[in-house]
């Protein structure tokens, strides 16, 4: 009798694992489809590319050397960066070793930034849907891309992983939204664990991303309340 019970539990566990894998693939597929939606829209693609060229074209082709750039080897070869708690860029440099090259690093940085901004547009589209046209999302993307607070970092220091961190936080917020959909059940662990992992990696780039994540989650809670979306509302 115990053998049959154990087999049933084992089969149930396998079924749960398969179901979790299917759900995770479905969530990732939805994010990719929404990501493609923006870049298949001409006004969004043209707006982001044009804003990138206008905002960073001169900086990219005429790089400056800051004090942190002169200490590139100390940060990413000798281990000062992980000692500061910023271990992700150090790890990336070990996996993909690259000498100091402002143009190449800056170009990669801007491509990653474009991806990160698109993921934030996906976050807002999950909240607003068609209530905001693609022109509204394009305007948001262009403003974020050309923000002086962020662009200043590109001028002085292109190796800090800030742009990648923004994308990881956006993904963490998306998975947090999925956790809200599940409610307080055993299934909540499926999306919340990836969210925690992504948040941890983002903090490895820059510890201030904790504030970005918390503010984003608070913003999501406020928008859910204001928009009264049925899929996120809890039953009394």
Can you annotate each of these PLM segments?
Residues 3-4, 17-37:
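Short, Lys/Arg-rich, polar N-terminal cytosolic tail immediately upstream
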Residues 36-66:
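Transmembrane signal-anchor helices characteristic of membrane glycosylation enzymes that use polyprenol
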Residues 54-72, 80-92:
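Extracytoplasmic catalytic/substrate-binding loops of multi-pass membrane glycan-assembly enzymes
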Residues 79-107, 111:
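Short hydrophobic/aromatic helix or loop-helix immediately within or flanking a transmembrane segment
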Residues 82-86, 112, 132-180, 204-209, ...:
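Membrane-interface micro-motifs in multi-pass membrane enzymes
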Residues 169-191, 224-231:
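Membrane-interface transmembrane helices that cradle and orient dolichyl/undecaprenyl
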Residues 190-207, 212:
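Membrane-interface alpha helices of multi-pass inner-membrane proteins
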Residues 212-236:
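Perimembrane helix-loop-helix junctions
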């Amino acid at each position: 009798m115990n053998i049959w019970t154990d087999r049933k539990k084992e089969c149930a566990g396998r079924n749960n694992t398969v179901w979790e894998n299917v759900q995770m693939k479905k969530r990732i597929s939805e994010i990719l489809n929404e990501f493609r939606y923006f870049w298949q829209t001409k006004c969004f693609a043209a707006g982001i590319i044009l804003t990138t060229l206008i905002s960073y074209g001169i900086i990219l082709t005429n790089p400056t050397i800051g004090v942190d750039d002169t200490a590139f080897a100390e940060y990413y070869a000798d281990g000062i960066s992980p000692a500061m708690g910023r271990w992700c860029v150090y790890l990336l440099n070990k996996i993909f070793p690259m000498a100091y090259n402002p143009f190449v690093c800056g170009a990669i940085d801007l491509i990653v930034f474009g991806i990160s901004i698109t993921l934030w547009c996906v976050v807002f589209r999950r909240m607003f849907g068609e209530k905001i046209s693609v022109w509204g999302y394009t305007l948001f993307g262009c403003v974020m891309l050309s923000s002086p607070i962020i662009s200043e970092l590109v001028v002085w220091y292109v190796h800090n992983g800030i742009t990648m961190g923004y994308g990881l936080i956006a993904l963490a917020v998306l998975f947090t939204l999925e956790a809200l959909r599940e409610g307080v059940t055993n299934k909540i662990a499926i999306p919340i664990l990836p969210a925690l992992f992504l948040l941890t990696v983002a903090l490895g780039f820059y510890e201030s991303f904790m504030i970005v994540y918390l503010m984003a989650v608070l913003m999501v809670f406020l928008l859910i309340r204001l928009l009264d979306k049925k899929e996120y509302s809890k039953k009394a």
